[in-house]
Amino acid sequence: MPETKNTLPNTITVGLKNHSMMLVDAEAHQIPELREYFSFFVPNYRYVPAYKNKKWDGKIKLFNQVTRELNVGLYEHLRKFCSDRMYPLRLQETDYGHPAQRNKVDHQTLVKFQESLKLPFPLRDYQYEAVSHGIEKKRAILLSPTGSGKSFICYNLIQWYMDNYGDKQILIVVPTTSLVEQLYKDFDEYGFDVEENVHRIYSGKDKTTDKPIIISTWQSIYKFSREWYENFGCVVGDEVHLFKAKSLSGIMNKCVNAEYRFGMTGTLDGTATNKLVLEGLFGPTKRVTMTRDLQEKGTLAKLDISILLL
C-alpha cells in the first residue's frame, strides 16, 4: 500500500514514470545527497584521462538530478536512504501503479499450476522458492550457482507470466548464441512447444515475430528503437554478470512496459556491470542456493581436490 499522503517536511515523493524509471521529487538540499548515494567509482577510474585532468570525479551517477529519474529496481535502496536519514517517503500512484506493488502468492494455486504444466520433473524446494519470490516481487536478480537449474526456474516463471499476461510478449536476453540455442533446447525438453511459441534472434535471424517468447543475444538487439521493445511485459536476463553495462541499460530502459524483470546469474563477482546498476535494471538480489548446500544434498557432486607436484 502507498505510504501516507500527508506531506511532512523533507518528504521524498516517488512515483512510476514507467516500468523502467521512477520519478523522485525531493527538496533542493536532498538532491545532492541522492546523487551521491546512488553513485559508485568506475574500476580503474584513476587512470582515465578525464579523471587525471580533473574533468570527472571517477563516479557513475544513477540518479539524474535534472530529470529526477532513478531506475525502479533501486526502490528498496531509496527506502533505506530515507530510513537512514529519517526522511518521510510518500508513494504516488500513476498509470503504472507504484514501485512498492507486490503480488500475493497463493501457494496451493501455484502448485496446481505447476502440476498442470506436466513438467518432466518437479521443482526442487529452492527452485520453487525462487519462482514464488519472483512472482511476488515482480523483479529480482536470482543468484544461483551452476548446476542449480536456473533455466528450469526461468521456464516456470515465464510459464506463469504467459498464463496471467498473455497479451504481452516475453524477452529473454543472453550473452551468446550458444545460450540462445541451449535455452531453446531446454524449453523443448521441458515439454514446451518451442516451434510454435519461441523465436530466436541472432545474426542472420528475422528480428520480428508474433510468437510470445523471443530469445536473443544482447548484441543483436541493443541498437533497436524503443518501439520494438514496447510490447514486452516481461524481460529475463540470463548470465547477467557477462553483460556490458551500457548495452544492458539501453535494452532494459527501453522496456518501459516490462513490469516483470528477472536477472539470472551464478555469480556477481567480477561482473562486467556494477551490482547497483544490475539491481536498478532487474531488482534486488535474492540468493537462491549455494554450491555447498547442493553438494550436501547430493544434487551436485562434491569436489575431490588432489595436488600434483611436477
Language-model-detected regions and their locations in the chain:
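Inter-Walker segment of RecA-like/P-loop motor cores
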Residues: 187-226
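Conserved pre-motif I regulatory segment
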Residues: 59-63, 90-92, 96-143
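N-terminal accessory nucleic-acid engagement/regulatory domains that precede
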Residues: 2-96
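Post-DEXD/H (motif II) to motif III coupling segment of the RecA-like Helicase ATP-binding lobe
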Residues: 233, 241-306
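Loop/turn-to-beta-strand initiation segments
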Residues: 168-169, 210-213, 232-234, 258-262
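Conserved RecA-like ASCE ATPase "motif II neighborhood" in helicase/translocase motors
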Residues: 213-251
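Post-Walker A helix-loop "phosphate-sensing" segment adjacent to the P-loop in P-loop NTPases
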Residues: 161-168, 191-195, 259, 286
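Conserved Walker A/P-loop ATP-binding site and its immediately adjacent core
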Residues: 148-162, 166-189, 248, 270
